Amino acid sequence: MKRMGFNHIDLATTDMGATRAFYEGVLGFPCVRTDVLEIEAAGTVEHVFFDCGDGQMIAFASAEGSPGRWPANLDTSLSKGLGLGRGVYHFAFGHEFARS
């Protein structure tokens, strides 16, 4: 099987508006897909995909439209829920910056 990198990473967010503002406005990743899913255990889930380049995406799921389905204090960090220090589990985007 030919390795082709990842298709997408999927994370949770409790504020889709702020997530979109950061990934679209700050990082410049265009939104390429938005789904609204009806999931019995989670209710209505908004699922948004951003293009990171090279055919790879990062996606976020939010159940803001289903109050009470996800805890209001949902911890969306990668490390804390595993009992690890900050930054232990993470992902990084490659980039090119012009050097002066």
Model feature map: region roles:
Residues 1, 49-50, 80-83:
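Short secondary-structure boundary/capping segments
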Residues 3-6, 88:
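Core-facing hydrophobic residues within beta-strands of well-ordered domains
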Residues 8-10, 49, 90-92:
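Short aromatic/hydrophobic contact patches that present stacked aromatics
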Residues 12-65:
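Core segments of cupin and vicinal oxygen chelate
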Residues 14-17, 38, 73-100:
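Vicinal oxygen chelate
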Residues 68-71:
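Long, contiguous binding/interaction regions
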